[in-house]
Structures are given as C-alpha cells and as structure tokens.
Swiss-Prot record:
SUPFAM superfamilies assigned: Pseudouridine synthase
Annotated organism of origin: Clostridium botulinum (strain Eklund 17B / Type B)
Family: Belongs to the tRNA pseudouridine synthase TruA family.
GO terms of molecular function: RNA binding; tRNA pseudouridine(38-40) synthase activity
UniProt protein name: tRNA pseudouridine synthase A
Length: 244
C-alpha cells in the first residue's frame, strides 16, 4: 500500500462543497471518481478542509491510500485527464503512510476578497463579495490586531459545529487594498464552522461604522453570536495554503 498526497485547486462555484454527497456534485466526489478511473480502486480521500459550496481553493491538500504502481508524481497528470475543468491537481507525491491531510495539518491560511464600490458589479461576482457602502479600511486593519492570538471564538461560529473546543489561535490577520479591491488574509491553527466568514462580516460592520472599533475585544470575550457580524457569502473565500 502507498499513500499519495495531492495539492488541488478548484473553482467552488458549481460545487456543493468538498465533502462527498449521494446526489450533489462535490469536489471529493469528483476526485474519487477520477481516482477510480485511473487505478480501478474505490479509494477514500482525506481533505485538509471541508469547504462549503461556493468556496474556492488554491491549495487544498488531500491524500489517499492505493495499491497502484503509478509513480506518485505521475498522479497529477493522470488525474487531470479525468477531472472536470473546475478542478486541477497541481502537485502529487508519495508520502509516509502516517500522513493525513486533515489530522497532520498545523494550520491554514484563507483569503477573502471584497469589492467596495457603489456601482453594480457585473464581472467576477463568483469570486468576490460586493459591498456598496464605503468601508473605513484603516479601522478594519486596526480591528485585525484584536483577533490575533489565542482566544475563544465562540461568537464567530455558526450552529451545527462538532468542535470539541472553540479556542483557536490566529497567527496572522491582515488586509491589502488596491483601489476598490480589499483582500483579507487570515491564518490560524484551525477554524470553527464559518469562523472566517463571520469574522469578515464583523470587519465589514467595523468598516461601515455599525460596530465600534473599541467594542471588538468585548465581542470576542462575551462569546455571543448575535453580537458579531453576518456570515458573509462563500464566494469571496479562498483556501490559500495548508501548513504541515
């Protein structure tokens, strides 16, 4: 038996997330069908993140066990001939048997992109969140500093999570602005269900003035979901990198 690691990029627009489902189109489902076609084996893949529908990835990591004799680095080319156009394997390699895409991970980085302009948006809507009201980006940047470090992020989690603890450590959190495009980067040792999207919603509230900058620490410490921001749409979210 051999353990194959894949780095995958995908456009999440037309997927119902990563995790395989009986009827709906998912990234994991398409990947496992492609593996079956080239190896003749029904392999179960492990993914580094269980992304929701509409969320994209530049570097999702997956692994699977196989008895195939195909060289590890050749799986990239072989799988890409069988995968749909909105999924691509960008690297493949054989790794130690104890490697697990999810449980071996030490952290992840996500980005979220906002287009901040009053005019309607017609191009690239599947990759950004359009905010018409002018945002105070300087206040948003200051708010990022409040989130860095080890905190209980209960206020930034949607219902339905099976997480044993709501404590996470954010290592990096910063914003880059280029004209009307605001790109938010956040990396942590792990994320709760919808945590990134709710934190971004909170930043937007700060940017519009709905939430005061000085209230951020209390929102984090109180742990009350209704005090934090909305869960912004999935389309602006990208899994940028997984750390091992």
């Amino acid at each position: 038996m051999r353990n194959i690691k894949l780095i995958i990029e995908f456009d999440g627009t037309n997927f119902c997330g990563w995790q395989r489902q009986i009827k709906d189109r998912t990234v994991q489902g398409c990947l496992e069908k492609a593996i079956l076609k080239i190896t003749g084996e029904k392999s179960l893949t492990n993914g580094s993140s269980r992304t929701d529908g509409g969320v994209h990835a530049k570097a999702m990591v997956a692994n699977f066990i196989t008895n195939s004799s195909i060289p590890g680095e050749k799986f990239r080319e072989a799988l890409n001939t069988k995968l749909p156009d909105d999924i691509a394997v960008i690297k493949s390699e054989e790794v130690d048997m104890d490697f697990h895409a999810r449980y071996s991970s030490k952290g992840k980085m996500y980005s979220y992109t906002i287009v901040n302009r009053y005019e309607k948006l017609s191009f690239g809507k599947q990759y950004v969140h359009h905010v018409r009201k002018e945002l105070n980006v300087e206040d948003m940047k200051k708010a990022c500093e409040c989130f860095i470090g080890k905190h209980d992020f209960k206020a930034f989690m949607s219902p339905g999570s099976s997480a044993k603890t709501t404590v996470r450590t954010i290592q990096e959190f910063y914003i880059e602005k280029n004209e009307d495009v605001i790109k938010i980067f956040i990396s942590a040792d792990g994320f709760l269900y919808n945590m990134v999207r709710i934190i971004v919603g909170t930043l937007i509230n700060i940017g519009t003035g709905k939430t005061k900058l000085e209230d951020v620490d209390n929102i984090i410490n109180d742990g009350i979901r209704k005090r934090s921001g909305m869960c912004v749409p999935p389309n602006g979210l990208v899994l940028e990198k997984v750390f091992y």
